[in-house]
Amino acid sequence: MVLYTTPFPNSCLSALHCVSWALIFPCYWLVDRLAASFIPTTYEKRQRADDPCCLQLLCTALFTPIYLALLVASLPFAFLGFLFWSPLQSARRPYIYSRLEDKGLAGGAALLSEWKGTGPGKSFCFATANVCLLPDSLARVNNLFNTQARAKEIGQRIRNGAARPQIKIYIDSPTNTSISAASFSSLVSPQGGDGVARAVPGSIKRTASVEYKGDGGRHPGDEAANGPASGDPVDSSSPEDACIVRIGGEEGGRPPEADDPVPGGQARNGAGGGPRGQTPNHNQQDGDSGSLGSPSASRESLVKGRAGPDTSASGEPGANSKLLYKASVVKKAAARRRRHPDEAFDHEVSAFFPANLDFLCLQEVFDKRAATKLKEQLHGYFEYILYDVGVYGCQGCCSFKCLNSGLLFASRYPIMDVAYHCYPNKCNDDALASKGALFLKVQVGSTPQDQRIVGYIACTHLHAPQEDSAIRCGQLDLLQDWLADFRKSTSSSSAANPEELVAFDVVCGDFNFDNCSSDDKLEQQHSLFTHYRDPCRLGPGEEKPWAIGTLLDTNGLYDEDVCTPDNLQKVLESEEGRREYLAFPTSKSSGQKGRKELLKGNGRRIDYMLHAEEGLCPDWKAEVEEFSFITQLSGLTDHLPVAMRLMVSSGEEEA
């Protein structure tokens, strides 16, 4: 399949579209700024309360007449541009495919050679997030502002979290082979000028986010303007890039516990012990992009294995080459111990995105300029990106669309096929956006017999109003039909002579319903959950005890307790914190107007990550290895991102 790299089939239509949008944009921008000036966020309200001279109100009163005059002057040009823009949308393609062409063999092509479908299994990491990159006036309805700056910061945080150096912990003690849950922290020392991660001698040091330079020793802000300096994607999966931490049984005696003093008097939250402010996170320095000093390091980074006694005379862990195994090999070792023995996989609230993130699905990337900024930042890690997904005008749907679908997909692996469908059954405000589903087929490897190993991913955003359960169920029905059609239309295999082997089938996105509200019973019992497994769900209306909500209470986004990834992580690990800062379903029979009656559960989990256990290659199975609720985007969105790591094991792997 030929992927679309431009929104229009020829340069003439593209040029005409640029001219028409240039005529519309001044009016669009003025309307957005004018409306935004009358919708303050809680952060701005606090600033105004501390402003005795009321300078902000004075500026608003001064500039409002100017904006109105400019708006009236721009209306004729906007009308003329609209006359050209609207009919052009019938020729517009449903997405834009972006790939960094100068990758050569350093990017996705090299990843395809890592797994041949034999021997040890292969893990794949998926993440989904609603980032609320709406026009600024609309984002303020959700208590968010400064969409352009947030887009850049979101991209930097995701890139820095996914590109973290891989950390492997080995225990020299023959008796103590476990690490306490409190010691799951970022156990890396600052990298040297050559970008090589240094082993930590003696004691273990927590590293704050400002000390981490994720892109080969460069500061994340150094390439904010023009994207990555070298143009190469970050590859954190090679053993040479691993940061080795050895805990000696003779010297250390035991692993560090949560209450152990930290060298230098550094605060336990990894923030250097400084005072916490209420400044929004997207106004911080580029280096403050998600704490690496969190006690919630991903298990992909913190691989636990037992080291032998044959340490080299130099005492350097890097000298023992036998320790540099691939993560998938070490994680399947019999000596591996889970943090949650009562669960088939690990789960956590993490302060940053998982290391070695392979696939990213985002929702509500509506603003075009914000989408471009976000894409440029994500290209520092992901080689393949689909953005500006959706339709405009009256194309594809019965009602006029002012916004696209808001979906964005990023991948480290090559994309083979793409399909997009717009939901026709929408109403109210959702009818103005072309919300739908994006279906992708990616290649993740090849067998020695030249059979392609592929995976299927679907990203969607369902109808938002909570009372419209019937509309969401209809969209879930369409989603299932489109999933089956996409698998059928893109499959080139036959049962007798398969050309492709399916490794995984994942569905994710913002479903806008939860599994604990009595008002969402219709969606909770949908047949989609019989074909795809939800790792957080026990059954309709019944969540696993560790699952938490992914929708934040927008009134508390800028509170000191949750304004940083570390702080939000600590809050969400306690039941009281979840009750205060997560959104909970409200009962229709609430006795007092405006009062929330908190129901069972740990908040509204409306962001889902599902995977199929059937329809894969025979003798292969995909099992959840870890599941994470991520706080790295605190202050930048009103949703918690979620991530899932799947281990795809072949029949040749030992049980």
From Swiss-Prot:
Region (Disordered): 210-319
Intramembrane segments per UniProt: 11-31, 65-85
Keywords: Cell cycle, Cell membrane, Developmental protein, Golgi apparatus, Hydrolase, Lipid metabolism, Lipoprotein, Magnesium, Membrane, Metal-binding, Palmitate, Phosphoprotein, Sphingolipid metabolism
EC number(s) stated in the UniProt entry for this protein: 3.1.4.12
Residues the entry annotates as binding Mg(2+): E364
Bias (Polar residues): 279-299
Reaction(s) the record says it catalyses: a sphingomyelin + H2O = phosphocholine + an N-acylsphing-4-enine + H(+); N-(15Z-tetracosenoyl)sphing-4-enine-1-phosphocholine + H2O = N-(15Z-tetracosenoyl)-sphing-4-enine + phosphocholine + H(+); N-(tetracosanoyl)-sphing-4-enine-1-phosphocholine + H2O = N-tetracosanoyl-sphing-4-enine + phosphocholine + H(+); an N-(acyl)-sphingosylphosphocholine + H2O = an N-acyl-sphingoid base + phosphocholine + H(+)
Membrane topology: Lipid-anchor
Post-translational modifications reported in the UniProt record: Palmitoylated, palmitoylation-deficient proteins are targeted for lysosomal degradation.
Subcellular location: Golgi apparatus membrane; Cell membrane
GO terms for MF: identical protein binding; metal ion binding; neutral sphingomyelin phosphodiesterase activity; phosphatidic acid binding; phosphatidylserine binding; phosphoric diester hydrolase activity; sphingomyelin phosphodiesterase activity
InterPro entries: Endo/exonu/phosph_ase_sf, Endo/exonuclease/phosphatase, Sph/SMPD2-like, Sphingomyelinase/PLipase_C
BP-aspect Gene Ontology terms: BMP signaling pathway; bone growth; bone mineralization; cellular response to hydrogen peroxide; cellular response to magnesium ion; cellular response to oxidised low-density lipoprotein particle stimulus; cellular response to peptide; cellular response to redox state
Protein's name in the database: Sphingomyelin phosphodiesterase 3
Gene coding for it: SMPD3
